Every structure is written in C-alpha cells, then in structure tokens.
Amino acid sequence: MTDGILGKAATMEIPIHGNGEARQLPEDDGLEQDLQQVMVSGPNLNETSIVSGGYGGSGDGLIPTGSGRHPSHSTTPSGPGDEVARGIAGEKFDIVKKWGINTYKCTKQLLSERFGRGSRTVDLELELQIELLRETKRKYESVLQLGRALTAHLYSLLQTQHALGDAFADLSQKSPELQEEFGYNAETQKLLCKNGETLLGAVNFFVSSINTLVTKTMEDTLMTVKQYEAARLEYDAYRTDLEELSLGPRDAGTRGRLESAQATFQAHRDKYEKLRGDVAIKLKFLEENKIKVMHKQLLLFHNAVSAYFAGNQKQLEQTLQQFNIKLRPPGAEKPSWLEEQ
C-alpha cells in the first residue's frame, strides 16, 4: 500500500513556465504556511543514532595453518549491545515511517481541499467564533499599540513639564520684578506633573492588562485552535483514506487493511472531537473573561482621563484607589519579585 502511495506522489504534476520556474498561484503563500504547519511535527531523532549496516560481522578472518581441509571462519557473536542497537534502530525506523505516512496523507488532503477536489469537515458555528476571535485579537493589538504610544507621549510631556517648572522656579529667584508671575507658573507646572504621573500610572495599568489579555489569554486559546485545526486535517485525511478502501475490492488482504484503517480513523476522530470540545470551552471562558477585564479597564481609563483633563486632582487620586493602583515615587527602584508576592 505504501508503495502505491509513494508512486502517486512521484507522478504529481507541477505546472511549469517556459523559463523553468514553477507557476505561482494566488493562494501559494497561505498554502506554504499550511504545509509548514503539517511538516513541523516531524520526529526527533537526535537522542540516539540509528545503527545501520551489518551486525556481528567479523573483521579479518584468520585461517590456521594446520592439516584441516576446511578453513574456519572467525565470527563475533552478537552481544547485548548489538541487540539494544537493533531495537533502537527499529523503533526509530517505525517512528519515521509512521510520520512519513501521516505527513503524506495530511499533505494530500490539504492539497485536495485547496484545489477543490476533496471534502472537509466544517463546524460552521465554531469556525465563525474562531474567525471572530482572530479579528478581535487584531483589533485589541491595535488598541495595545496605541496605548503604548499614549504612554510614551505622556512620559515625554511629564519630562517637559518638569523641566519647564524648574526653569520657572529658577527665574523667579533671579527676576525680582517677575518673581510672582514665574512663581505661580512654576507651581502650575508642578501640579500638572503630579496629576500627569497619576494619569500615567492609570494608563500603564490599562496597557498592562490589555497586554496580558492579548498575549496570554487570547494566545493560549489560539494555540488550542491550531491543535484543533491540525486534528481536523488528520481526521479528514484518514476519513478519505477509509472511504477509498471501502470502495475497493474485498479480499483477505483488503479486509485486514480496512480494519486497520477503521481503527486509525476512529482514533483520529476521537482526538478531533476532544479538541473541538476543548476549543468551544476555551472560547466561552475567554469571552466571559474578556468582558470582565475590559469592563474594569475601560471604566478606569475613562475616569482617569476625564479627571485629569478636568483638573480634578481629588477624583484622579480616588480613581487609582478604586482600582488598587499604587504609584511608585519618582526615582524608586522596581521592587524585587519577593516583595511583589
């Protein structure tokens, strides 16, 4: 059966231009990524080496000088080490063989789906939720990028206001005729710096929470989605293989292969259904967690920004207390991990 499969693979036609280069199809980029994902699960053979060649063979045979008519051949008996090496080599060969067959079947199924010659299992509701998650993640990544830009601008503004306040304070000491004017401008800049530091703390907390939601929670769910999609491809590949065997002639050899294909198909079906259930559960919990986190963070962001631009220092400080945000004093070092526990 394997020889037949490899024979088909060897005769696959690839469209070629007149200049000898393979023709690029519109979906080549996506297809290449999918093929890389299929090939990435190859076996790791670096732990032990595969032993090849003869086992227990003799070196240079010694023929004794005597009256014997028949020369005696020196042979080295196989030791325990040779048996272990044979076992390791056999296991590695089986791993490579199974991986090669699985990769071929999945690649064949992927190409059949891409070129419209094969069928695929589709859970419309689940795939819609997965696509919605990917779109939501892209939008949240955009919000995260803008939030980081706002943090950088606020920090730069604080540095400028602090320097301007120091300059006004210095000039108030050196210009008696303008001492009062420079003085209250210096106090204004200092107050703006204090409120700005409070706002910066709130925005940093907002950005940190969004970052955790995007890079940890959403990414964890998408990793399970990738496992589900790989299991779906394997399930369809072995389903197609079973259907082709079922349509063939029924003899003693075919019945054995059919039973083996049925068992393999059932194993991949169980794996696919389990991962489909895992994805559905993670999507549900992710949605609940996202709503809970964003409700809190959007309220914090609104209250802090509104209080800052209204010049309401008391409300700004109350906002940070409401969300248990503690500001580090200027120049303070970051606490150690032990202090944060």
Curated annotation (Swiss-Prot):
GO terms for molecular function: cadherin binding; GTP binding; GTP-dependent protein binding; identical protein binding; membrane curvature sensor activity; phosphatidylinositol-4-phosphate binding; phospholipid binding; protein domain specific binding. One of its GO terms (biological process) is mitophagy. It holds the Pfam family Arfaptin. The modification Phosphoserine is found at residue 72. It is found in: Golgi apparatus; Golgi apparatus, trans-Golgi network membrane. The keyword Nucleotide-binding does not apply. PANTHER family: ARFAPTIN-2, ARFAPTIN-RELATED. Forms homodimers or heterodimers with ARFIP1. Interacts with RAC1. Specifically binds to GTP-bound ARF1 and ARF6, but binds to RAC1.GTP and RAC1.GDP with similar affinities. Interacts with ARL1. Interacts (via N-terminus) with IKBKB and IKBKG; these interactions inhibit activation of NF-kappa-B. This is Arfaptin-2. It comes from Homo sapiens. The lineage of its organism: Eukaryota, Metazoa, Chordata, Craniata, Vertebrata. The gene is ARFIP2.
